[in-house]
Amino acid sequence: MASTTDMSTYKLNHTMIRVKDLDKSLKFYTEVFGMKLIDQWVFEENEFSLSFLAFDGPGALNHGVERSKREGILELTYNFGTEKKEGPVYINGNTEPKRGFGHICFTVDNIESACAYLESKGVSFKKKLSDGKMKHIAFALDPDNYWIELVSQSETKPKANISNFRFNHTMVRVKDPEPSIAFYEKLGMKVIDKADHPNGKFTNYFLAYPSDLPRHDREGLLELTHNWGTEKESGPVYHNGNDGDEKGYGHVCISVDNINAACSKFEAEGLPFKKKLTDGRMKDIAFLLDPDNYWVEVIEQK
């Protein structure tokens, strides 16, 4: 086994969220958005399952690529029996005092047509194109009220085709962008774009692994949102989706060429671990903690 690791091969593989009713969520993402269930693990003994969804049609960016070697995967974690509970089970990360995770984003080939299509399918919206000042983005709501941002790709087609949609990015809010960016750079990611919004007093940073594609045509991006001034607050500002009784968002996951070498490198860099490879029964995965205590899973490419 090689003792080195090549960060240029790393992928931002997936984003995990917990869902109340798996059947309802699978139907939403596959039948409405056209995603494909590319893998599923059921743990009867522990009473939960993991379902991995991706855009995988003939025109998809990562069509047919092995699960661990691709980007743009959505992992749905389902704990048996939650669908029988009354009311919402999970938090979406956008309401105080449990803000943290913000949204996932799908880029589309014609945003007006895509939004009209989603409305025809009965999809609820947090923000329609016509709402507010920003007429070029919309936010749909999934069955658990997680936000799905909709943004145009670099080229607009005459009519939206769900087979061209891409799982572009995942957004989390960060207290202080400097240590957060430094952390993700130690994972091999780079800031590929930055957008300041003086009126709203926030900045968005987009990080990713190397690619020649325009930002809106890619998959596997991480968006860090910094609300100006939070870095001056004492203690944690955001909820990571995993701590305490109220859960929702789980983690992002990077896949690496050599997990032993990668974790050794991360440890040498002083990055904190939630779970080291040697911890627990699962010796083939690790979890890092970023500066806001968000979990970052590490898996090996097959």
Swiss-Prot record:
One of its GO terms (cellular component) is nucleus. Its cofactor is Zn(2+); Cu(2+); Ni(2+); Mn(2+). The keyword Flavoprotein does not apply. InterPro entries: Glyas_Bleomycin-R_OHBP_Dase, Glyas_Fos-R_dOase_dom, Glyoxalase_1, Glyoxalase_1_CS, VOC. The active site is at E149 (proton donor/acceptor). CDD domains: GlxI_Zn (cd07233). GO terms for molecular function: lactoylglutathione lyase activity; zinc ion binding. It comes from the Eukaryota. NCBIfam families: glyox_I. This is Lactoylglutathione lyase. It comes from Schizosaccharomyces pombe (strain 972 / ATCC 24843). The lineage of its organism: Eukaryota, Fungi, Dikarya, Ascomycota, Taphrinomycotina.
